């Protein structure tokens, strides 16, 4: 299937891009500038597109993002430290973000006669982000079937929606994903902070996957305390 991957430049979506390149016909990456403080992730998406020799579309929706106020990812709100399973991480929710991005991605796919749009939502996102859950994926597909009826047939691929981030790391290793060429940290500094939810989740995923983590973290050990109250299953 001719597929466009929604790629932020993070570990999950870059791994998905490599997976699609190996298993489908990757025809492009689409990224979104929504005014996120960690905008540097877009540079990593661009590198991925160059590496896989496909076009990279960066869609500027910062004007919209500016109205979706209250999120630590877009506003002058402190990004919380800790595990993703903590209530404080709800500060990182950007309301309706995936619905907005996917609607644009589907329009792009229809215009380019693509067969599918692929998105890297995963099981670890379910607790905090409602637009990463299976119910949302299924409902969005039904909505797009109606929206594009008679014009295009575009499938929403979400191969990681029911698996852990550790499983994504394993899949990334299988497909040769250069993990050092991905960006996760929500604080957007240099290097990864090692303390925000996405840094903790990234560090934990490599540990559970049994794959060496090439990432430099400002705080190398915070993740151990952050995950101590939560259980996870090793994937291999």
Curated annotation (Swiss-Prot):
Pathway it works in: Purine metabolism; 7-cyano-7-deazaguanine biosynthesis
Binding-site residues, ATP: 7-17
Gene Ontology annotations of biological process type: queuosine biosynthetic process
Cofactor binding note from Swiss-Prot or TrEMBL: Binds 1 zinc ion per subunit.
Keywords attached to this entry: ATP-binding, Ligase, Metal-binding, Nucleotide-binding, Queuosine biosynthesis, Zinc
One Gene Ontology MF term: zinc ion binding
InterPro entries per the UniProt record, alphabetical: QueC, Rossmann-like_a/b/a_fold
Organism domain of life: Bacteria
Enzyme Commission code(s) on record: 6.3.4.20
Cofactors (names): Zn(2+)
Pfam name, any one: QueC
Residues reported to bind Zn(2+): 185, 193, 196, 199
Reaction catalysis annotation: 7-carboxy-7-deazaguanine + NH4(+) + ATP = 7-cyano-7-deazaguanine + ADP + phosphate + H2O + H(+)
UniProt record similarity statement: Belongs to the QueC family.
Task performed by this protein: Catalyzes the ATP-dependent conversion of 7-carboxy-7-deazaguanine (CDG) to 7-cyano-7-deazaguanine (preQ(0)).
The name this protein goes by in its record: 7-cyano-7-deazaguanine synthase
